[in-house]
């Protein structure tokens, strides 16, 4: 028996346009997430302002309609595991095939724009930083900004509540007028200066706040073998990583180290914009990070996450020193990440030796062989599953 429902009482809940708008938002978000890798590998986002806009292609939504099939024999059925938008038809017709004209209608494609700030929102949603291990003081107590909590009669001049002070003076003046009227005097009150009793100061209270106690150490090979493409990929990796962490945590320290055969601590601007040339001693950059940790960041107190980016091309006499340095910094860190960029030959780079000889559970290595691999490398380094794997 057919069942009919009267939807006239509530048009809003059954408004077809609401479902269309919801579906549209889903497609927009899906397209943005699918194109994150293209933006990171093709667009120069380093140093851009949060208002920089990027164009994202989005497939249009059509009204549901019945269409003629290909009139083929047989019936196509699903498996029961289909999702919305999946095609179960065996029809293989395409709008264009082998560079020849097709006979099918094309898809509506249009572009939407998002800012760098919005892009970072999607990156934050798509990634998850490995959970900071609990240290003795992994959550430090800091004082948040002081908040005003009423008034008091004493304090320092910068906290003088001018409006409240004037109101106290006016109240005192009005009180004097009332007193004069009560005794039958109507004398005009002349100059009426402020007195110490009129002054009011803001009463402030600071609230303790817990924040993560972590340091990120970025180490980058800037030697002659690191061409512009490799340096661009390395800087893109570090830029996205730094922006992501700063949005997720309030109290994270950053250190920047660049190296050739020698290493030096640099500021953030120099790290992302300044280039050098020369030979490569991988150990120099990692040892500089080790010295920095021993000098400023006690591993018993701090959560330490060094990340090192290089093309893996190392001077042969430094290979053993590099192995020792990686083992040592892994012992001092929660996780040490090694990113190898566009290696010329897999077996001749340090990635092969690190993978074979470094047995530390918290040592994580990835290779970026093409620009499109950058996004997967970032996700792999920062995935929550990776943290769980390291704890096993």
UniProtKB/Swiss-Prot annotation:
It comes from the Bacteria. Disulfide bonds: none annotated. Residues 80-94 have a biased composition (Basic and acidic residues). It holds the Pfam family DUF444. Residues 75-100 are annotated as: Disordered. Gene3D superfamilies: von Willebrand factor, type A domain (3.40.50.410). PANTHER family: UPF0229 PROTEIN YEAH (PTHR30510:SF2). Belongs to the UPF0229 family. This is UPF0229 protein CPE1333. It comes from Clostridium perfringens (strain 13 / Type A). The lineage of its organism: Bacteria, Bacillati, Bacillota, Clostridia, Eubacteriales.
